[in-house]
């Protein structure tokens, strides 16, 4: 459907209209604001189920809804494996984990995340996601993982996202994904985020296109965006192929 020019035009018009109404702020996951479109939440769920990662790395924490979503999916993987193998397990203990990075984890958000039932699967790291010291902490926290999935959703300028891709994409395992959110900024009208430094020509999509041109280990999987139609991550589903 994503190849249909008429549907594509309608989709861009709709996304532009609802973006002005802060559509992504209307949803929660297990009680925490997730700040994602429902279609992208479904896509994230599908990827986690398909890939079955040991570790999910996320840049950008905000209220923690995305961390909680990833952690809950990892919990469901544990439950599914226990059922298949006929084993019992402690649901509060898991080898799977979510690593969240944010330059400023607000105390009330940290407290809410730490009180959440999914907290045992989450580790939060405060610092710039592109600071070498922060990147080193993430690498150490992910050490030993065989299957890694990455979600990039923090600062949306070209330079920042490019640095994130250079830092975190190499951690992605073959067959898994680095998903870059808010590439849709390039497709929205100029000035759609007039209170932010990103805009057309300076955003995650421009960073993706610049980065992937030099990284043949990854390819853009457009089948996902063509299926979703409504997504904030067009050209942002990057699959590691070698």
Feature map (PLM): residue ranges:
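Mobile, glycine- and charge-enriched loop segments
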Residues: 1-42
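S-adenosylmethionine/decaboxylated-SAM
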Residues: 30-32, 41-242
